[in-house]
UniProtKB/Swiss-Prot annotation:
InterPro entries: BRcat_RBR_HOIL1, HOIL1_RBR_mRING-HC-C3HC3D, LUBAC_E3_Ligases, PH-like_dom_sf, Rcat_RBR_HOIL1, Sharpin_PH, TRIAD_supradom, Ubiquitin-like_domsf. Residues 225-301 form the Ubiquitin-like domain. It catalyses: [E2 ubiquitin-conjugating enzyme]-S-ubiquitinyl-L-cysteine + [acceptor protein]-L-lysine = [E2 ubiquitin-conjugating enzyme]-L-cysteine + [acceptor protein]-N(6)-ubiquitinyl-L-lysine. The lineage of its organism: Eukaryota, Metazoa, Chordata, Craniata, Vertebrata. CDD domains: BRcat_RBR_HOIL1, mRING-HC-C3HC3D_RBR_HOIL1, PH_SHARPIN, Rcat_RBR_HOIL1, Ubl_HOIL1. Residues 1-23, 152-172 are annotated as: Disordered. GO terms for biological process: defense response to bacterium; embryonic cranial skeleton morphogenesis; otic vesicle morphogenesis; positive regulation of canonical NF-kappaB signal transduction; proteasome-mediated ubiquitin-dependent protein catabolic process; protein linear polyubiquitination. GO terms for molecular function: ubiquitin binding; ubiquitin-protein transferase activity; zinc ion binding. This is RanBP-type and C3HC4-type zinc finger-containing protein 1. Component of the LUBAC complex which conjugates linear ('Met-1'-linked) polyubiquitin chains to substrates and plays a key role in NF-kappa-B activation and regulation of inflammation. LUBAC conjugates linear polyubiquitin to ikbkg and RIPK1 and is involved in activation of the canonical NF-kappa-B and the JNK signaling pathways. Linear ubiquitination mediated by the LUBAC complex interferes with TNF-induced cell death and thereby prevents inflammation. PANTHER family: RANBP-TYPE AND C3HC4-TYPE ZINC FINGER-CONTAINING PROTEIN 1, UBIQUITIN CONJUGATING ENZYME 7 INTERACTING PROTEIN-RELATED. Keywords: Metal-binding, Repeat, Transferase, Ubl conjugation pathway, Zinc, Zinc-finger. Belongs to the RBR family.
Length: 714
């Protein structure tokens, strides 16, 4: 743990190299004194690394010097020390500190920009946070001193002072830093009294401080963090390897590098708390594998993120050195001797062009200094190799199809997304040269086996259902499978107590159905189900009626059906024997009917039984008896009078005389059961029976009455 006036930071082991020099040392020129020098790697405009011929990341050094004879005269130079062994010192660029702006972007990345147009920028990458913080402290102090002297000189000469340059932190006083160091030592040693004295002294100075535990307080092993990623329309789960001592800001950079979500659009929530960038994961309770964090993504417009800024930051993130997690792990595992190796930045650049290095080295000379335009030319020399290294042909494309819902890359033969179960795009086809791996072949085999088992189970179920239906069809009555209420008597029927009608699946109790059968005048017994909006028009089957009623009632129902069939048949003839139920359907070529019931011979021409006489003899005998029988004559005259006066009519089907006593204009013939419209003296329905409007009186068709005097013929 370390403490400075600029803020608490995680302490790194002291650098064993001689790359950082504090104090005063002689410079190459006799008129300047070097204040500090530090090794860096350079990125121009935050996009591509500064590629110098023959100069690796370890050969570039930032140097801050001052002129002792002139107050506020500071020079910031970028040197190439790769040619030091040959006795040459190459100054790549040198700036007057009053003409630049210096900004701390991240703990390991600083940016230098010109105060005057074209405002060119150079970004520096440092090896460790401790070196970068010490360098920033010295540079910021020198920068403020240079500006103060410039403002004083401008005031004395009557000129307006230049506008203030952007700085990142206030200049720490030496005494404050000493107290911070003493406080760190006292806390690490457990000296409560000394720590209290130092804390009181800092409180009296009102020093701006921030505290953060050192990495040594955390475990060195990575943990697997379960991250639930959500935006306004979708969500998914990913796993991220992190260290508990990592900050939220470092986690945002890691997600940016791995998944492309810019830190500005990331909102982290851990333990129902909105996370701050400077706090560590351990402070939010992340300690072991499986701990959960929530990442909410906002829109780029809401985060005020433009496409140019995103591309610039993305390219910078791809070329940045690895995180301090890996360097810390290597330093802890290998000891202090491995610190230089652990803190050495990795390079993603291709191999340098040695011929370009030799040419530029010869042209540069020992002490030649380059401007920003020359630096840009040096960068352009390495662009072909850099573009080749970052080209798309170097990237291996994973075979498969991308899920349109969650964008997961699935294997070509998979029919649905492995993550969200979405269907595979219809236009996708499996490549012809694709060969599935062992796991995919196993999955395909398991799918085939699952389909086979499903088809087998479905076939077994079909056979069981068919057997159940065959067994049920052999029963005359189908019992109700579950508890139900009879819609006639409203009695609750347990399973098996009621009867489920085959035609309509309506359920009633046996007693109610038996009563409906016995009370029905029509041989076709209709289903008794009725409600406010529906009347069932299905009928009971013959075997259902046979199973519900007794044998005598069943025979009576059959006889009733025969009677109705006889009356509705046009060519029917009933046996003339009294109380004989026999009847027949005659044809034109047949003149006699031998009744199978009473064994009598009926004459179909005379409609009578005249055994021993022919038809002529029977007609003469009938005429003679009618003349002498006054009762028969009076009956005949009365019926003719009723028909002529309109009080009676002949049935349009069988011709017998029917009479309406009272009520509506609908009546039914007692012989043939034909429905008759009294006002029109014709049949109510067409030849197909009830409901046929192709004939009959057509009453209420198109909302029109059949006759102006119609009194509801139904």
């Amino acid at each position: 743990m370390s403490l400075s006036s600029g803020g608490w930071t995680r302490a790194s082991p002291p650098a064993q190299s001689s790359s950082s020099h504090l104090g005063h040392e002689a410079s190459q020129s006799a008129c300047s004194t070097v204040l500090m020098s530090v090794k860096v790697s350079v990125c121009h405009s935050g996009i591509r690394p500064l590629c110098l011929p023959g100069a690796g990341d370890e050969s570039l050094r930032l140097q801050l010097s001052m002129d002792p004879g002139k107050a506020g005269e500071f020079r910031l130079a970028l040197r190439d020390i790769s040619a030091t062994a040959a006795g040459r010192s190459v100054f790549i660029a040198e700036f007057d500190l009053k003409t630049v702006q210096y900004e701390v972007k991240t703990p390991l990345c600083h940016e230098l920009s010109l105060a005057t147009p074209p405002h060119d920028r150079i970004s520096f990458k440092f090896r460790c946070e401790q070196e970068a913080q010490e360098w920033a402290t010295v540079v910021m102090s020198s920068l403020r001193e240079a500006h103060r002297v410039a403002i004083s000189s401008s005031t004395e000469e009557g000129r307006l002072p230049p506008p203030p340059l952007a700085t990142q932190s206030k200049a720490p006083m030496p005494r404050t830093e000493e107290i911070c160091a003493e406080l760190v030592s006292a806390i690490e040693a457990g000296d409560v009294r000394s720590a209290s004295v130092c804390a009181s002294s800092l409180a009296k100075q009102k020093a701006a401080l921030s505290i953060q535990p050192s990495k040594r307080n955390y475990t060195d092993s990575e943990v697997c963090l379960a991250v639930v990623v959500e935006d306004a329309s979708s969500s998914c789960c990913v796993s991220v390897k992190v260290f508990p001592h990592s900050t939220i800001g470092a986690l945002k950079q890691q997600v940016f590098s791995d998944y492309g979500f810019h830190p500005r659009v990331q909102r982290w929530v851990i333990g129902q708390s909105l996370c701050s960038d400077h706090r560590s994961l351990a402070s939010y309770g992340v300690q072991r594998d499986g701990d959960t964090a929530f990442l909410y993504l906002i829109s780029a417009r809401q985060a005020r993120l433009s496409r140019g800024i995103y591309q610039q930051d993305q390219e910078s993130a791809l070329l940045m050195v690895p995180t301090t997690h890996q360097a810390h792990q290597e330093a802890v595992s290998n000891g202090p001797a491995a610190l230089n190796t652990a803190s050495r930045p990795y390079s993603t650049l291709p191999t340098r062009l040695h011929n370009s290095h030799n040419t530029l080295s010869n042209n540069a000379g020992g002490s030649e200094r380059l401007g920003l335009s020359d630096i840009r030319d040096l960068i352009n020399l390495e662009l072909p190799q850099l573009n080749e290294a970052l080209g798309p042909n170097r990237t291996s494309i994973q075979p498969g199809w991308a899920c349109p819902t969650c964008t997961y890359i699935n294997k070509p033969t998979r029919p649905g997304c492995e993550m969200c179960s979405a269907d595979r795009p219809e236009g996708y086809t499996v490549p012809g040269n694709y060969r599935p791996d062992a796991l995919e072949l196993r999955r395909i085999q398991q799918e085939k086996e699952a389909i086979r088992q499903y088809q087998q189970a479905r076939e077994t179920e079909r056979r069981e259902n068919f057997a159940r239906l065959v067994q049920m069809d052999g029963q005359d009555l189908v019992p109700n499978p579950e508890r139900v209420e009879c819609r006639i008597c409203y009695v609750e029927l347990e399973s098996g107590e009621g009867v489920l009608l085959r035609e309509c699946l309506h359920c009633f109790c046996k007693e109610c159905l038996r009563s409906v059968i016995l009370m029905s005048e029509d041989p076709q017994v209709a289903c008794p189900y009725r409600d406010e909006s529906y009347a069932c028009d299905c009928v009971l089957q013959e075997r259902e009626i046979r199973a519900l009623v007794s044998v005598d009632d069943y025979q009576h129902w059959l006889q009733r059906g025969l009677s109705v069939a006889e009356s509705r048949c046009e060519g029917s003839y009933h046996c003339a024997t009294a109380d004989c139920p026999g009847w027949c359907v005659y044809e034109d070529t047949v003149n006699t009917f031998h009744c199978p019931v009473c064994k009598k011979q009926n004459c179909l021409l005379c409609k009578a039984i005249h055994e021993g006489m022919n038809c002529k003899q029977y007609q003469d005998d009938l005429t003679a008896r009618a003349i002498n029988d006054s009762a028969a004559r009076r009956t005949r005259d009365l019926l003719k009078t009723l028909v002529n006066s309109g009080e009676a009519m002949h049935c349009p089907q069988c011709g017998i005389i029917v009479q309406k006593k009272e009520g509506c204009d609908w009546l039914r013939c007692t012989v043939c059961h034909t429905e008759i419209c009294w006002v029109t003296r014709g049949p109510r329905w067409g030849p197909k029976g009830p409901g046929d409007i192709s004939g009959g009186c057509r009453c209420n068709v198109n909302k029109q009455r059949c006759h102006p005097k119609c009194q509801n013929c139904h």
